[in-house]
Amino acid sequence: MLHATVLPILLWLATLAYGFDRKEFLVDGNELPGFTKLKNTKHWTVPKMYAGHLPATRDNDTQYFFWKFENKKTKKNDETPLIIWLNGGPGCSSMAGALMEIGPFRLNKKAEVIKNDGSWHMRGSVLFLDQPVGTGFSYSKEDNEVSELDEVADNFMVFLQNYYATFPDDKDRELILAGESYAGQFIPYFTKAIIKFNEQQRDENSKINIKVMFIGNGWLDPKRQYLSYVPFSLEKGIIKKEDPAFKDILKQHETCQNYINSDHTGHSELSYPPCEAVLGKIISQDKTQCINVYKFDEYDSYPSCGLEWPVDTKFTKQFLTDKKVLAALHANDERSWIECRPDVKLENIKAKPAIELIPSLLESGIELILFNGNKDLICNTLGIDNVLKHLQWEGETGFTDEVQIFDWVYRDDLKSDKEKVAGTVKYERQLTLITIEDGSHMVSYDKALISRGILDMYYDDVLLVHRDGKDTLISSKDGDIDGYLEDDKSQDENKDNESEDESEDENDSDDESDGKEGDKQENKPDDSDDESDEEDDDEDEDDEDDDDDDDDDDGDDEDKKGDQNSHPSHGDMNGGLDNDLETGGEYYQDEDEEGSNFKAFFLILSLVSAFIIVAAFYISDYIKSRRHPILVDGDGRSRLNKSVTWASDIENGSFDIEDDDPEFGTEGMEDNMELEDVFSIDEEDEEQLEGVVPESTRKSKKGSKKKGKYFSVPNDDSAEDIELQDIERH
């Protein structure tokens, strides 16, 4: 009890003692190769950056490295979040996430920064963190290593408090913990630590504002995910029963199953070496080429098998070993950067898999958003599907009949009909499951713009339409759903007004033709006045339309001016960052001198104001009918359940993995583990078993499905096994 009370106080006192100045972390972008060539565009801005080391232990011994990107248009205390991104491994640097996935930069073949149109910094500040100690540029002076996830969480909390003390403006922002792969273990543990910290705070202002976890291709439940390798590979045609190596794969799978069912006292429940070997046998069936474990429809040279994928990895290493770059990032250059360090190992003898933390986190009100590329093998969609199918939260198991299904498409421009299939979405009881069509293990690497739509869903910046009997979510490059709906509504109203005007003109013309000639001449002055008034009304409406168009044009002009004025020459293409680093090189724009006629200005302003007041009521009703909040409630957002499966109607040939099959043997299974999560050998393989496996070990009832005994034919010519401890979960 004393420990629980004193620890937060010690953490806070530690942060006060350091007293870091954020100016010391400011990054001079001019020192980064290619930076001066970057220009602002409508959908991308040159970021303001901070980087360096902050303590992750109270004795200041362990130093975590971070690199933070801000959108220069972001104002203080606005509603945009702080996103902390974590790569996996353990031991894989989040700088890969910064330069190959969701950061504002990508690298060309010269290791120069170029813009990433799908950067998440356009939706909030993004911080990339190297952790645990020993990962990337993070280090410990005394070589203090951690071995448990709880210890890693403690270090993260110390870093986070130091960060907030250094960047107090971010304290009130919503914190989003996001990451991929083994971050599926980190993020739930870190979130649990944050919730515990918040419970100990008496002052509401001292609490950390966390509401959601984003986990991509997550490693959540090793038992079920290990057992998905063979059935998933069969389903996708990666392996076939006729393959010479198939029997050997089955034998290794049985070894994995037996290991999972054994007593793990004194051993980790997060890593099973015999199960890692299953994947090694699947991807390397000969010594010439093998399957890319991170994107199974691509092949790689043996024995790499995806370890050198993606190709940007070599450019990233070149960039992060450049002395000028390291100096600009305030990074420790005592050892060379590598993407994944094999010496960073977590024993996790005490730790439980993070899947066991998730039910309580969901029930506490934290949202969980899982997103998966459907071409990933190492953390595949079938494995995640099996994990969720057995997950119990809020009194139910898995998704129920209340789940709603949505298709998801992406458009560069909402006004265009050109769109790409992005994936599908499933949502119920605080948990969202998203699949990205044709996505890899590193979803944002090959689907950057589409993956940013995940953030847009969370913040209700997607369009919901009903077509072909299905609900469909539409995300876009700019995510400006409000602007799109307002423009769409204005166009509809303008068309209605034009139709009314034409009708009035026709009626007036008919009235004039019915009058007598004398009456026309007698009433000519009055008719002239009426016609003049009508013309004035038409001109006023035209002025309103023109003003709306001018507003749009002005926005485009301002973007263009921002680009031109921000980059007057090739000598200063970074928006003035070298002139004023602390202010982040604000982009100043010249005042528009047109419209200096105040009389005309106020006339137009009055007309626009009147138009806005009238249109506001219509727009409000229109938005309510077409725009639906997604994912979270509270703070003005209502809940909308949503659902879609990315591996619909799983077909594993003769290998049935249905839950309700009564013929699966479950003897020796631990607690909730059942063999139906894997597969069974069916009747048509019975002949293959004869002469290889004793009949006493097999069930041969007609129509039955059985565990049987996995069999193997010795094969001295089989390919050398790949050690899967070398294949990291980035």
Swiss-Prot record:
Enzyme class, UniProt record, top EC level: hydrolase
GO terms, biological process: apoptotic process; proteolysis
CC per GO annotation: membrane; trans-Golgi network
Lineage top rank: taxon: Eukaryota
Segments of this protein annotated with the region Disordered: 475-590, 684-730
Pfam families registered for this protein in UniProt: Peptidase_S10
Coiled-coil residues: none
Transmembrane intervals: 600-620
Residue stretches of biased makeup (Basic and acidic residues): 486-497, 515-526
Side Lumenal, residues: 20-599
Cytoplasmic side, ranges: 621-730
Active site (UniProt): 181, 376, 441
Subcellular compartments: Golgi apparatus, trans-Golgi network membrane
Keywords attached to this entry: Apoptosis, Carboxypeptidase, Glycoprotein, Golgi apparatus, Hydrolase, Membrane, Protease, Signal, Transmembrane, Transmembrane helix
Similarity field: Belongs to the peptidase S10 family.
Name by which UniProt lists this protein: Pheromone-processing carboxypeptidase KEX1
